[in-house]
Amino acid sequence: MRERVEQYILQHELISPGDKVLIGLSGGGDSVALLHILKSLCTRLDFTICAAHLNHGIRGEAAHEDAEFVHDLCDFYGIRAYGGYADIPRLARQRGETLEQAGRMLRYDFLEEAKAFFGANKIAVAHHMDDQAESILLHLVRGSGLRGLCGMAPRRGDIIRPLLCLSKAEIESYLTNENLPYCTDATNFIAEGTRNKLRLETIPYLKRDFNPRLVESLCAMGEMLSEDESYLCQIAERELNAARREGGFDRAALNKLPRPILSRCIRAALSEIGALTDAERGHIDSIIKLLSARTGARIEIPGADVWTSYELICFGHYIKQTGEWEQPLCLNGETETEAGTYRVTPCAAMDRPRDRYSACIDADKLPADTLIRQRRAGDRFHRINAPGSKKLKDAYIDAKLPREKRDLALIASGRDVLFAPGLGAAESIKLNVNSKNAVKIEFIQK
């Protein structure tokens, strides 16, 4: 089985020589198997590993026992580990989300923090074929498009999934044969929550009455559809670049494209400005209609504005240029400026907003001379987890922020930009597990 995982890693180029891979280690069987397999491949494939464990604040004493187990396991293998705690039930209530939704976002935030702590460049998670089948089936019943039916990718950004080639049964057999101890989460066997119901009730029913090889069939379908999706996205990227102009995209060029390619062009444009996460099918439809609208027409979608400007369609945050000014930042309410409103509210530690026009930061790290002002020559910005600072102008260029969107009010201390709409917060004020005064900063345009 280790050989299969090794071949899967090589086939999908998940790990390269010299990589440092952070393993998301819950202590459950899947993550323990992942740790054991990757540990055995370290020398052969020339990479190193470390681990991270997050106590979700859900299962009381059992969760503390899991954390102790992970600590002891990492000590046994001589692996450095990073631990953390989060009150996910409270976070879910604050956001109006389910435990699943809140937990997933915070879990990946935590893993990114641990990755930065260790200087790792990959994060390995223990999703397997049964998880893949669940995801595909869940997207299917929710009416997903082709992208959702592809399931989870072996690699997306710095997240890798080396066990997607194995079934749950194969992992359990491996744990038994290798005599590996692991923790059992009793809540996984309670048919509450969408995924648990799917895992415990729906999939067994479909396997029993329709297709005993349901998991394998769904995973094979996902792989085939992924090839189609990849090809369509390549075409869309080429067409989007061909339509790219200064400040936007050629409306006429986009309007000539077939609907499957056009919708992917729009998703790619939204992704460039960090506004794809909450974009739904209805938003894509509205943007397609906007292509034929009069100049100056504008619509708002979560995290962005889209508007027409003569022959162009523009994606970003629609603003008007303002003169130079500065004013103090209110840390417990709203601050009105010429360019828009800054709103500061308490937030949960480890919270992460869904666009680059808001950020959760450590208010205790704000310098005494912090203020809101227009950008100035000589300003510098140090993006979170970046190796160093750079000129603000270069940061805007790297983020592909159109010129007309670079004069939003920013927050600064001297020449150091602490928060810039479209870029997010600076390294110097980022949250960590020890932060005591977490606040959310939002910029709301006029």
Segments predicted by a language model, with ranges:
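Internal, active-site/partner-interface "lid" segment
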Residues: N188-F189, G193, E216-S226
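AMP-forming adenylation/ATP pyrophosphatase catalytic core
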Residues: R2-D30, T48-C50, L54, A86, ...
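Core alpha/beta nucleotide-donor-binding catalytic domains of modification enzymes
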Residues: M1-L25, G29-P204
